[in-house]
């Protein structure tokens, strides 16, 4: 009976920790998607506004950044498949970002054209990630995540000990 009570108490505590974690994570995600980060530079603010204006634009820019981080340009066709969008939509995003100087493209025919993020897009994303890291640090999510892991270990140990 005591074993069942201990296990139940551990499960309840774990559920409360998970709920608190979920609430804090949700607050961070809402803050990010609401564009709550204050950006001083106009060029960076324009990148932020563009990337937050639609999920496809955000993903387009993230794929450009990843291509640059990996030093592996991404093709038009790869992006079309990844984003699952029409030629018109992709061509429009590509042109808008190229005209704004946020991507560097090759001059090949459209299907084989490749892109990488520009230095400003990379700098903007790096600044954004510094903001996200600080938000996570301030939220205490890491501590909550570790507490959940420890709770799982206690539950597993309690189950094992009382078999």
Language-model region placement:
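Amphipathic alpha-helical dimerization/coiled-coil segments
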Residues: 127-163
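C-terminal regulatory/oligomerization modules of transcriptional regulators
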Residues: 1-19, 148-163
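Short acidic, hydrophobic short linear motifs in intrinsically disordered regions
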Residues: 70-82
């Amino acid at each position: 009976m005591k074993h069942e009570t201990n296990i139940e108490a551990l499960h309840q505590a774990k559920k409360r920790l998970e709920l608190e974690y979920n609430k804090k994570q949700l607050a961070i995600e809402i803050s990010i998607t609401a564009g709550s980060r204050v950006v001083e530079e106009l060029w960076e603010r324009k990148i932020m506004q563009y990337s937050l204006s639609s999920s496809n634009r955000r993903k387009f820019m993230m794929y450009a950044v990843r291509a640059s981080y990996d030093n592996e340009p991404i093709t038009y066709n790869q992006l079309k498949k990844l984003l699952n969008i029409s030629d018109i939509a992709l061509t429009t995003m590509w042109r808008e970002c190229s005209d704004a100087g946020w991507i560097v493209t090759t001059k090949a025919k459209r299907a084989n054209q490749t892109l990488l993020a520009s230095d400003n897009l990379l700098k903007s994303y790096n600044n954004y990630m510094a903001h996200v890291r600080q938000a996570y640090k301030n939220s205490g999510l890491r501590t909550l995540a570790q507490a959940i892991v420890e709770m799982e270990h206690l539950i597993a140990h309690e189950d094992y000990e009382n078999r």
